[in-house]
Amino acid sequence: MATAQMHRNKVNSVALPSRVATETQSLILVKRLLAVSVSCITYLRGLFPEYAYGTRYLDDICVKILREDKSCPGSTQLVKWMLGCYDALQKKYLRMVMLAIYTDPEDPQTVTECYQFKFKYTASGPVMDFVSNNSNSVSTCSDAKKTSILLIRKLYILMQNLGPLPNDVCLTMKLFYYDEVTPADYQPPGFKEGTCEGLMFEGEPMYLNVGEVATPFHVLKVKVTTEKERMENIEKSIFKKQASKQPQTDEEKPDLSINDDLAQDNNGDRKRDDIETLKVEDLNLTCQEDGNLQSDDSQNSALADSQEKTSQAAPPAFGRKTRSGRIFQKPDLELKNQKESARASKGNQQARKPEKRSQSFEITGSQEDPAVAKRRKFSEPRTPLN
């Protein structure tokens, strides 16, 4: 019985490399972190149905992993986007993956929430914030695995506390490159040449630094940008002010970072019913040492749209419930406006809510990064939403 349980735990786990002594091991770690992070985001933001995910365990964390499912073309397409990311990552071309959520299918350049995964490639050792006095390979490996798990914990905490997205949203992905090493004609599988000029943010953006993971060969940073309204019900203890390394002007707003101590203190909270009672299913989005994923490579098959329109259930009158189980109460003013709108004629329905202002969206947003004015190469999914 004990042997069967050990085998079950092994099969149902997402293993991070116990050692990160080679570039291959580092690549596996970064790929798996990207897969788990994207799965966490899309699951807790309600972008795909429950059956599009399998349940696995990362250390003591129960995580949902996106998988290919014929009955959910959107999840299948996102898995293929991830394959394209892996191709660029393995070639050391990829600078950043931007997973963007927008509300208007006719205006994908105006986003309401986005997630940035930034990559650096280091050959002479990592640029770490957690420097050990005894700098040896064992310490480095241990720190990389520890910070990887901490990054996922912090991402889960943030996703479980953000206010809900609008009922109908669309999803897209944009890839950015290191132009000095990327061939001009290179495009990952499933992507085409794109543009990010004129990117706008719907509403007032809030920039959140989730964290970073460094190995001797890669550095991965994760940043989230969401609308300020979705932050109103989040406890202040979750965040800490980001210390700026450069003077800020009056117009600049400091980024917020997820509190490391809070993520570590919540270790025991991972066994809550809303996580642990989920059904165990097959894991399809796994990163093998050769970087291959099992998938159908046909570019011309009917894979639905690259930009997948998603829907959430209609909200109850008392508020919105997210997939994490948290209920967000609607302000009295909003409830009043909804009642007035219900009485209004159909011609006046557009006046239901005041139009949100859009602001130009700063893609890089990191004060540590050099100027990127010359970086002009972008990729976007090959098949746009019609």
Swiss-Prot record:
An individual GO BP term: synaptonemal complex assembly
Assigned keywords, A-Z: Chromosome, Differentiation, Meiosis, Nucleus, Oogenesis, Spermatogenesis
Compositionally biased spans, kind Polar residues: 289-313
Range of residues in the leader sequence: none
UniProt superkingdom: Eukaryota
Protein name: HORMA domain-containing protein 1
Family matches, as InterPro entries: HORMA_dom, HORMA_dom_sf, HORMA_MeioticProgression
Domain HORMA: 24-224
Region (Disordered): 237-274, 289-386
Residue spans of biased composition, Basic and acidic residues class: 329-343
Location of the protein in the cell: Nucleus; Chromosome
Matches recorded under Gene3D superfamilies: HORMA domain
Membrane-crossing residue ranges in chain numbering: none
Pfam families the record matches: HORMA (PF02301)
GO annotations of cellular component type: chromosome; nucleus
Task performed by this protein: Plays a key role in meiotic progression by ensuring that sufficient numbers of processed DNA double-strand breaks (DSBs) are available for successful homology search, promoting synaptonemal-complex formation independently and playing key role in the male mid-pachytene checkpoint and the female meiotic prophase checkpoint.
